[in-house]
């Protein structure tokens, strides 16, 4: 009896122990399943074509969608380097793919992890992927140095993805265009590369770049407009996300081109990379940071420069440096934010002439400067600013005073006299060369062209020609003369304006009168916005034309077309009424 009772007690203990073990295994399995299959992760943040920031944010490896938080491990090719990378806290592994024995009698066609000129390695791509996918959650960037490696590698990636093993973003990189200082062609064939990706592994982020070479005797050589436009021509129609690798030592001098490139698609980003021998300025990195949204640019930069850059970039008291030809994002408008939040302001001027002083409102926004000319062209004319009070301030004094004011501003020069156009642009160019223009600058006028030709206004062709020749780094802001708007914005008026502005690489903001929108061709605003990814519309209203109620419907209709790309140049009271209406709706 005692033995039976003892046996029963032992059996009970074993039963409880077995239940405990099974429960522990079940709990572990559930936790693992939840970790690997968090809601939305499998189809979104953890897919090979997912946004890298969304993926790392879902894992808690970055704290916000800021590409500066992403860290990189270079050339994780050999088994030793790969192991070191896997044991690090780096978030993305970058490795080079070549073909074993490339160009020799021993060429096998097997993708290996090696940077040219190396053609042998202790690590094949398959071994590398097995290790990285099986033991880490790090993002992956594969750099292809030869077109022969691309097809077999993408076949392998597709098989592993179909087996459910690739559950993270994959970046596919190759230099497909000749870039700065390259005298010979070493790039991967662009047509073949893009075709292979499209055929074999389209669900990945593309990383197409330019071959480059830094020459210390030509430090200012950089990417040309033609190089950047050719790249957009190649990949503008692909459905994938695209991140363009750009040599960081060359980016500042080519910023007008890369600013244009980023504006062409929300799918685009840049990845700035640094060669070990490149001289690099932290000011250049800060300039890029200031002129982009935080999710648009990754920084693959060496220490200690990277830490220095991060410290300065995240310093809220640092005075930023904005590109004069850039958009109002992120200076005055956050990505995806409402254009109604950007306010147009007119400075208060006391006195006149050289002793005049300017007072700015407490709020931030676009500073509207109605610009004329003092003197004639033959008398060394001076651009001046006309104010509602009748005071006159030289444009140079106005801009220099603005340079000393803290806060976020944009400048909107409205050319009131045709003769003031080129002298005003020349002044902008000179101040920019002296480092005294740190804000986006718009240059606009009511222009004469085609069906809206009216004497006394700036000729449309002259506006564009003067900008191109004297100071191209601006936003062009053309409007129609009031004399031709009796029937609103008719079809021919829109057609002629769009034909004039066709092919502009600068941003353009079409200036429209709110009172006339209700009498205009249906879809006028939508048609103007569709002309370019960089196009915006600014709706203005003169209170002498009537009260807010008379334009309320037109203003709300304009905002309904695109709340992010329509701006409002309104009296403060009207703007408050519109904000209240938007809030109620």
Swiss-Prot record:
Compartments where found: Membrane
Membrane in keyword set: yes
InterPro entries listed in its UniProt record: Memorin
Protein name: Protein FAM151A
Keywords in alphabetical order: Membrane, Transmembrane, Transmembrane helix
Family, per entry: Belongs to the menorin family.
Keyword Ribosomal protein in record: no
């Amino acid at each position: 009896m005692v033995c039976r009772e003892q046996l029963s007690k032992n059996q009970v203990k074993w039963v409880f122990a077995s239940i405990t073990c099974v429960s522990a295994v079940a709990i572990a399995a559930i936790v693992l399943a939840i970790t690997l299959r968090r809601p939305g992760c499998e189809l979104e943040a953890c897919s090979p074509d997912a946004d890298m920031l969304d993926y790392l944010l879902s894992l808690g490896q970055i704290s916000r969608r800021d590409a500066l938080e992403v860290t990189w491990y270079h050339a994780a090719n050999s088994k030793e380097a790969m192991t070191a990378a896997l044991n690090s806290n780096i978030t993305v592994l970058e490795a080079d793919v070549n073909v074993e024995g490339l160009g020799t009698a021993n060429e096998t066609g097997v993708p290996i992890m090696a940077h040219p000129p190396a053609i042998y390695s202790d690590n094949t791509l398959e071994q590398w992927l097995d290790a990285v996918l099986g033991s880490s959650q790090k993002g992956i960037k594969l750099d292809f140095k030869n077109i022969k490696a691309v097809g077999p590698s993408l076949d392998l990636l597709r098989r592993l993805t179909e087996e459910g093993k690739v559950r993270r973003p994959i970046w596919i990189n190759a230099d497909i265009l000749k870039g700065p200082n390259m005298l010979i062609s070493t790039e991967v064939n662009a047509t073949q590369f893009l075709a292979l990706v499209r055929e074999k592994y389209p669900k990945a982020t593309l990383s197409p770049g330019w071959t480059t070479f830094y020459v210390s005797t030509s430090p200012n050589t950089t990417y040309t407009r033609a190089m950047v436009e050719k790249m957009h021509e190649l990949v503008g129609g692909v459905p994938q996300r695209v991140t363009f690798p750009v040599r960081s030592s060359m980016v500042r001098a080519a910023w007008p081109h890369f600013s244009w490139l980023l504006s062409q698609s929300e799918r685009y980003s840049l990845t700035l990379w640094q060669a070990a021998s490149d001289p690099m300025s932290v000011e250049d990195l800060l300039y890029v940071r200031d002129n982009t949204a935080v999710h648009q640019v990754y920084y693959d930069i060496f220490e200690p420069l990277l830490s220095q850059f991060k410290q300065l970039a995240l310093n809220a008291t640092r005075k930023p440096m904005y590109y004069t030809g850039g958009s109002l994002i992120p200076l005055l408008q956050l990505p995806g934010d409402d254009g109604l939040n950007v306010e147009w302001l007119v400075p208060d001027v006391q006195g006149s002439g050289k002793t005049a002083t300017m007072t700015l409102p407490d709020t931030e926004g676009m500073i509207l400067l109605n610009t004329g000319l003092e003197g004639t062209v033959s008398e060394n004319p001076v651009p001046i600013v006309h104010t509602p009070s009748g005071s006159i301030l030289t444009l140079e004094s106005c801009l220099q005073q603005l340079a000393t004011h803290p806060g976020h501003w944009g400048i909107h020069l409205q050319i009131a006299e045709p003769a003031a156009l080129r002298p005003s642009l020349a002044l902008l160019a000179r101040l920019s060369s002296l480092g005294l223009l740190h804000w986006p600058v718009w240059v606009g006028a009511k222009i004469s062209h085609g069906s809206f030709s009216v004497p006394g206004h700036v000729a449309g062709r002259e506006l564009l020609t003067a900008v191109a020749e004297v100071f191209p780094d601006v936003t062009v802001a053309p409007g129609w003369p009031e004399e031709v708007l009796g029937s609103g914005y008719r079809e021919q008026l829109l057609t002629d304006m769009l034909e004039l502005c066709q092919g502009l690489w600068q941003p353009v903001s079409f200036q429209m009168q709110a009172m006339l929108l209700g009498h205009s061709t249906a879809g006028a605003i939508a048609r103007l916005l569709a002309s370019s990814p960089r196009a915006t519309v600014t709706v203005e209203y003169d209170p002498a034309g009537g009260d807010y109620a008379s334009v309320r419907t037109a203003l709300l209709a304009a905002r309904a077309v695109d709340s992010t790309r329509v701006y409002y140049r309104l009296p403060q009271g009207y703007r408050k009424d519109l904000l209240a209406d938007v809030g109620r709706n």
